[in-house]
Amino acid sequence: MGTWAQFGLQDASSPLMEELTYFHDYALIVLTLITILVFYGLVSLLVSSNTNRFFFEGQELETIWTVIPALILILIALPSLQLLYLMDEVNDPFLTIKAFGHQWYWSYEYTDFNDLEFDSYMVPTSDVSFGNPRLLEVDNRLVLPMQNPIRVLVSSADVLHSWAVPSLGTKMDAVPGRLNQTTFFAARTGVFYGQCSEICGANHSFMPIVIESVPFNTFENWVTQYLEE
């Protein structure tokens, strides 16, 4: 979960988010080196008193500043293409969830079970219990088994929404009349918070997402108890 004055990314709770964090750091190093090189070139030109009115071309220099940027772009593109493939690939998901965005709450359906669906509303500030985050807690959490690939089918019942949980490295737009899908793999137990990431109206800021990742036997007990109720 994000905290006050946090400058970095949230702690990764899935293998995909770990890879995204590594790629972010790698790309940031490359961009920092490019910035230093460009700044050095600008300063060198500004302070240099050497001029040549008859210097019209430089084939070697033009080749260098064409080839080197191309190589840099390739070095950035290859890891990103791998990540795009990992984000898009769905290999035999253990569980499929339908998530529908509404103004201004989420509704969930466990497609592998009969009659297992519910709405998830934000808990008002006046009702938040001690220790739970303000504006992020919900009345019904999305309970899922840890260390299993989960597929989420995302859509909307009214306007554009976006289902996003940063610590799991997942974000998918909820478009009316269209069914998008995303996958994630919670590597550990815990409670992971997200929010609608597409401006959807007056209460856009008040439709959080809460995923509770639990061991499989705990998940089985939760499903049994919910269906009995």
From Swiss-Prot:
Instruction: Give compartment(s).
Output: Mitochondrion inner membrane
Q: Which PROSITE patterns match?
A: COX2, COX2_CUA, COX2_TM
Q: What is its main location?
A: mitochondrion
UniProt keyword Protease, yes or no: no
* Pfam families in alphabetical order: COX2, COX2_TM
- InterPro entries the UniProt entry points to: CcO_II, CcO_II-like_C, CcO_II_C, Copper_CuA, Cupredoxin, Cyt_c_oxidase_su2, Cyt_c_oxidase_su2_TM_dom, Cyt_c_oxidase_su2_TM_sf
The source's superkingdom equals Eukaryota
Task: Alphabetically list the UniProt keywords.
Answer: Copper, Electron transport, Magnesium, Membrane, Metal-binding, Mitochondrion, Mitochondrion inner membrane, Respiratory chain, Translocase, Transmembrane, Transmembrane helix, Transport
Q: Which GO terms describe its cellular component?
A: mitochondrial inner membrane
Residues annotated as binding Cu cation A1: 161, 196, 200, 207
Details of cofactor binding: Binds a dinuclear copper A center per subunit.
Q: Which stretches are Mitochondrial matrix in the membrane topology? A: 48-62
Coiled-coil blocks: none
* Residues the entry annotates as binding Mg(2+): 198
Specify which residues bind Cu cation A2 according to the UniProt entry for this protein: 196, 198, 200, 204
Needed cofactors: Cu cation
Instruction: Spell out the molecular function terms from Gene Ontology.
Output: copper ion binding; cytochrome-c oxidase activity
Ranges of the Mitochondrial intermembrane topological domain: 1-25, 85-229
Major enzyme class: translocase
According to its UniProt record, the EC number is 7.1.1.9
Q: Which PANTHER family match?
A: CYTOCHROME C OXIDASE SUBUNIT 2, CYTOCHROME C OXIDASE, SUBUNIT II
As for family, the record states: Belongs to the cytochrome c oxidase subunit 2 family.
Q: What is annotated about its quaternary structure and interactions?
A: Component of the cytochrome c oxidase (complex IV, CIV), a multisubunit enzyme composed of a catalytic core of 3 subunits and several supernumerary subunits. The complex exists as a monomer or a dimer and forms supercomplexes (SCs) in the inner mitochondrial membrane with ubiquinol-cytochrome c oxidoreductase (cytochrome b-c1 complex, complex III, CIII).
**Name used for this protein in its record:** Cytochrome c oxidase subunit 2
User: What is the scientific name of the source organism?
Assistant: Strongylocentrotus purpuratus (Purple sea urchin)
